[in-house]
């Protein structure tokens, strides 16, 4: 279902990124603020060049996207590994619940294997119960809990 994004996909991808960004701004106004361009075109084009931005289309219309990043982990006392981080995933809110996101995650998993990664990782806001449940249904496990405190 996923294909490498093209320059002409930017407006559709940016509109989808607004849907996700607005949720983040509502949950964490201390970090995010509302913007009409959460994915600037220059960054969009850079991610395409890096082969890290893919879109899902139905009948030629962009209905979702994924933004990826390859991570290499190593250090004293740790096993060296290459991971694919799912930085962002979005399915148009009007089309959620129809299996599109699940297929996108399956495609990202295949990309991770093709890139030689050992793991597919992501972060999700604790407030986003729907996304946590979705990711768990796709096979992700909760491995780390990040905490913060106001000072």
Named regions from a protein language model:
Residues 43-55, 85:
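A short helix-loop-beta-strand connector motif used in the catalytic cores of GNAT acetyltransferases and
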Residues 107, 118-131, 148-151:
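Conserved beta-strand-loop-alpha-helix junction that forms the acyl-donor binding cleft
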Residues 95, 99-107:
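Conserved acetyl-CoA pyrophosphate-binding loop and the N-cap/start of the following alpha-helix
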Residues 79-93, 123, 145-148:
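Conserved acetyl-CoA binding element of GNAT-fold acetyltransferases
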Residues 55, 61-70, 85, 90:
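Conserved beta-strand in the GNAT
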Residues 102, 114, 126-144:
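Conserved active-site alpha-helix within GNAT-family acetyltransferase domains
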Residues 21-43:
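Conserved GNAT-fold acetyl-CoA-binding loop/helix
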Residues 1-16:
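A short beta-loop-alpha structural element at the N-terminal edge
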């Amino acid at each position: 279902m996923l294909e490498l994004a093209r320059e002409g996909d930017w407006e559709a991808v940016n509109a989808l990124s607004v849907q996700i960004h607005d949720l983040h701004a509502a949950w964490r106004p201390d970090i995010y603020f509302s913007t009409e361009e959460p994915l600037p075109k220059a960054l969009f084009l850079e991610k395409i060049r890096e082969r890290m931005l893919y879109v899902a289309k139905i009948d030629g219309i962009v209905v979702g996207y994924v933004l990826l990043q390859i991570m290499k982990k190593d250090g004293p006392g740790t096993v060296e590994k290459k991971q694919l981080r799912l930085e962002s995933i979005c399915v148009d809110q009007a089309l959620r619940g129809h299996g599109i996101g699940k297929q996108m995650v399956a495609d990202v998993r295949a990309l991770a294997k093709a890139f030689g990664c050992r793991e597919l990782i992501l972060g999700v806001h604790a407030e986003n119960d729907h996304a946590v449940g979705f990711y768990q249904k796709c096979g992700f496990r909760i491995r780390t809990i990040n905490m913060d405190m106001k000072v």
